[in-house]
């Protein structure tokens, strides 16, 4: 796997810093942990922003950090990211907050240190847009939303 240097600042001065950890040597995403003063109960249908206590500095504009749900929390408890995927731009310096929604039927309790999401670093390309009279033809054309079938 490729690696990049990511500078981290811990924004909570009242707690000992804890660097993010990869769960296994082959993990693509690094776990983000909740940084809480007390337990947080997320009711069904409720959206909350969970602080991580971390701020990062990406090495250059060609890299972005993307926050994804943890598969176990989503499949077992219905805890998903409220915005689908969190995008951390290379020039953002604030605390990483994870916006989650409880799509389950039961309240979900988050404790300090719980692994609540995962962050993946990916290359980012800046689009250089230009206006065209028409787009090139393809076999698919304008077909979308299930136009290619399910089997």
Swiss-Prot record:
This enzyme is involved in nucleotide metabolism: it produces dUMP, the immediate precursor of thymidine nucleotides and it decreases the intracellular concentration of dUTP so that uracil cannot be incorporated into DNA. It holds the Pfam family dUTPase. It catalyses: dUTP + H2O = dUMP + diphosphate + H(+). Substrate binds at residues 70-72, 83, 87-89. It comes from Desulfitobacterium hafniense (strain Y51). The keyword Transmembrane does not apply. Pathway: Pyrimidine metabolism; dUMP biosynthesis; dUMP from dCTP (dUTP route): step 2/2. Belongs to the dUTPase family. GO terms for molecular function: dUTP diphosphatase activity; magnesium ion binding. Its cofactor is Mg(2+). This is Deoxyuridine 5'-triphosphate nucleotidohydrolase. The keyword Hydrolase applies. Keywords: Hydrolase, Magnesium, Metal-binding, Nucleotide metabolism. GO terms for biological process: dUMP biosynthetic process; dUTP catabolic process. Its EC number is 3.6.1.23. It is an enzyme of class 3 (hydrolase).
